[in-house]
């Protein structure tokens, strides 16, 4: 009973649709064959059922196919019912067919979401069918390309390549009017010029249709002329674009951008079969264009916050640098910072006279800025190695009964070092330390044979600064000292043993002088003189310091 009711409903609906038809149209669900006729006064009606109105068919196309290749042999019409199709046929055949619509304007494409009635008028036998493309990739390509064109319009209008490409393409299409324009200029205006001017675009459209219909034969038969035509038009278009040049003002860019975006929106609208999909896409693009700054900023800050929360709860492990990587990075960073310092000093607005007034040697600063010298000299490198990381525990002579105390009251002991057969003297270096905010004192031992020659300017003084023991000891002297020097206290040893075992000379880094005893009247040596003398002595001794690879000319002269 239910099946009978459903069949009656379907039959009633079909009868209602085809009530204006003399006979029921044939369904185009398969290939249909129609025989020849003597007269084409009557139309052959066919029926195409609509597809479901669903978004999956947004890029679907339905095409009508016949085996009649000559457009003059048949006429076809399409509409929503038989009455509409018959009316179109009657309008074309009035006045003996003078006002008949051109075959170029008749489309073989059917609306996939509407029930379509097709009428065919011909005297020839023919076959008719329907081809359904569920996904027309040409439509998909136009849709995606239009979206990309809309989003990149602001960048494309400022691109020189796009300017020349679009200009040449427009020139190639517009060149079809060249022949009509030349004829209009040469021919008499009253007889030929005005009709050509009025029908110029119609002639161009006809030429396009003719060329597209016979493209293959034209390319084969007139190959040289086609290549010459394209080459000439492209060269002329490129020359015109080169002469005018790309637009530079902001308003021209805005007009070009808006034009491209309007073209993109039109392509989106006509590339989709469903109006809802195309309208939604157009609305989303317009909203994105208006709220571009707020939208992108919100999305970016959302992901930044999400990344920060993730790093907080799941922090990444830090890989520590090994010694080679540390040295490589330190060397690279030092070079970069020194280059930045040179560039900063070379700038005119940085008051170079003020910078030179804040340094001890303006000449040395100038040589550093010009790249003639490094930021440190060989003497300073030698002094660093003499008093810094070159010194090991065995370079110091400590008694096992004594320990050192730092300003924060922490103790540390060093290994014992037994004196060899040769006696040693110590050289004390004073510098400002950043760890405790005070002046620090550091000493290095040298053999007695070296120190005797190194301290030769002070041999005649009776108030040589003696140490209190065989090691790195600092004495509490009744003579008042200037500055907050770090001091360590150790028990006194017999005076004779002190004098016999070790002596000490002080090198003050802050003042840049090697000073003798406080009561000495001898003039001190500069750090350069002191280091040059120490290197000369070091070359012939067993002093555990670095030897100079390239002796300077001043050293050779002193030797």
UniProtKB/Swiss-Prot annotation:
Belongs to the NEMP family. This is Nuclear envelope integral membrane protein. It is a multi-pass membrane protein. InterPro entries: NEMP_fam (IPR019358). Contributes to nuclear envelope stiffness in germ cells. Required for fertility. Residues 1-15 form the signal peptide. One of its GO terms (cellular component) is nuclear envelope. Residues 530-539 have a biased composition (Basic and acidic residues). PANTHER family: AT07567P-RELATED. It comes from Caenorhabditis elegans.
